[in-house]
Amino acid sequence: MVKSTAILGSTGSIGRQSIAVCRARGIRVTALTTNKNVELLLKQIEEFKPEYAAASDTEAAEKLRSALAGTDITVGPAGEEGLRLAATWRDTDCVVTAVSGAVGLRPTLDAIAGKKRIALANKETLVCAGSIVMRRAKETGAEIVPVDSEHSAIFQCINGRRGELKKILLTGSGGPFRGWTREQTASVTPEQAVKHPNWSMGAKISVDSATMMNKGLEFIEAMHLFGVTPDDIEVLIHPESVVHSAVELIDGTVIAQLGVPDMSLPIQYALTWPERCVSDADRLDLTAMSGLHFMKPDYELMPCLKLAIDCARLGGNAPAVMSAANEAAVALFLSHRLGYNEIYESVSAALSDIEFIAEPSLEDILASDREAREFIKEHYT
């Protein structure tokens, strides 16, 4: 179990649950960051007394600096630099990357360079630059332990037996609009899209779960985390969200990880691994369940999932373009400036427009990210 951790994005959904795990397990918190929620961050600071704090938003950063004036807490700059300083803060064993978007990439690489454990909750880091990130982690010996429930499940099922792995079975609920036609989803509102049937999550990831883009991002992430090809991963729709994922081994054995839909469990495991600690989470009562159901995804009704898998096969800068365009499109949708079905259409258009780079450098990836965001802004606002 780690003794100290920095939490990037401590006021978001994953960040707040990470805070709760640190409280329960007595893990020292050395650094905390937020985007804009200074009010909650100050409450967290009062309780955990970190050495460092930062807010990414410029106005929020000034508010934080003013509130902490005269204290011993170092207040970092706004923007990416504040996150990077948190990720490399002294005497920190682990960094929880609970920020959303490509902004988490450089801080994660910095933490890897510092040989810290990465409790990875930022999908975009591996989606955009998985090959680079995993290579650098191997070079430094930094541990990357997934926080996503699906990847945590796979991590636990493999349990070091990488050579015995035949196939990853990546499960997803299908979201709140499972079975809806494209005609029906055309009128979906942000308020409907953020209401996931099983999980309590932030707005962006809730929309991604509704469109199934989230499962596509997880598909790409799994490729890099576990060193497999697209042909080694099968997506299964599992409405109950009880089987968080499974693996098929070379002898035909299938090992699955089951549990209640509670993100505190994979967060705790990422911080305590290789130990397993007592948890206050609800227990799974198998006798209370009427059944577990699994089905193949309908790609016509889930075009974002198909698009992501196509990008996984294509590789290069395609996943980075897709991820950035999707992030920008979802932001427009949440502000009622883009239709639900237009999320897929706009991301697909960005992929068609932006130049493909087969073997991108980190700079190429970041440039592709910026270009994709600009494309969405220019053509859809």
Regions found by a protein language model. Name each.
Residues M1-T381:
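Catalytic, metal-anchored helix/loop core of enzyme active sites in primary metabolism
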